[in-house]
UniProtKB/Swiss-Prot annotation:
Molecular function via GO: ATP binding; heat shock protein binding; unfolded protein binding; zinc ion binding
Domain comment, as recorded: The J domain is necessary and sufficient to stimulate DnaK ATPase activity. Zinc center 1 plays an important role in the autonomous, DnaK-independent chaperone activity of DnaJ. Zinc center 2 is essential for interaction with DnaK and for DnaJ activity.
Organism listed in the record: Streptococcus agalactiae serotype III (strain NEM316)
Gene giving rise to this polypeptide: dnaJ
Protein's name according to its UniProt entry: Chaperone protein DnaJ
One of the record's GO cellular component terms: cytoplasm
Amino acid sequence: MNNTEFYDRLGVSKDASQDEIKKAYRRMSKKYHPDINKETGAEEKYKEVQEAYETLSDTQKRAAYDQYGAAGANGGFGGFDGGGFGGFDGGGFGGFEDIFSSFFGGGGMRNPNAPRQGDDLQYRVNLSFEEAIFGAEKEVSYNRESSCHTCSGSGAKPGTSPVTCQKCHGSGVINVDTQTPLGTMRRQVTCDVCQGSGQEIKEKCPTCHGTGHEKKTHKVSVKIPAGVETGQQIRLTGQGEAGFNGGPYGDLFVIINVLPSQQFERNGSTIYYTLKISFVQAALGDTIDIPTVHGAVEMSIPAGTQTGKTFRLRGKGAPKLRGGGQGDQHVTVNIVTPTKLNDAQKEALHAFAEASGDKMVHPKKKGFFDKVKDALDVD
């Protein structure tokens, strides 16, 4: 995958601003949404758009993607600030102390017997437009590595216990001598018998076969705050995969994906709505019920309103996640020109044009009564 494919999916350039990326995402997401687009391949396109936006809307992931491609955005390279997915600890490459300790058995090597936290997981949850505005509580179900229910995570057959590894004597590491041009180099490596645990399992658990873990379907309730947007994450501590050597469970990161609305668009706490009105309503003015996520609101359209005029409904937008308060709804007017007119409507518009002093390039054709008047020479 080249380093511009995600930009191509959204139809933006590589130097696009976050606002341009967000607008492009809303447009492409609505175009390919399975509930709207029934064409073959639309659902796959929709997923590709989601994947691209998840990366490009995050400044750190975007920087990694621009430099390394998709592998960098997914945490495949070091240098990120921890808390990534798949159990990476933020330091993708070790320091010099790790290099020297690997050759000389120095004290910089991590203790393989130490308790280690389990891997983090991620789960994408879809929210309706309204759920994102008002908040929701969702039950999510996913598979994770859990502590084995038969052996309680020991890996040993019930009634037996692990014993100290005879090869590493419980240290979890062994010394290996290597011949080099500089002489014999000694380095420490993880014990190949106990895999660093320091213990041997003579009789393995029949359920987990000695791993201490088993795949289970796990359910958890997620409280989603009002005002969330696509790409935001909710961290559930201890809901990831089981730890090692008695370590704690990892975390679950719930990634928000807000489905598009049929009538509204949103940017932050501001909601946008396009109001279609007739020429008569625009010219004479009217009072119209405007839909909002909070219910219909009566709004006055002043006489002489032009296409593109925007009105603001204060407090009818989305909640502000930071700082509190409520956003606004912007209502943009779109005057609809009729495409089919009957004779009476045409007569009325011609009369209006004459009264307004408008010169028609193609004057109206005379009607039946006009022809009768001409024949009788009646004014």
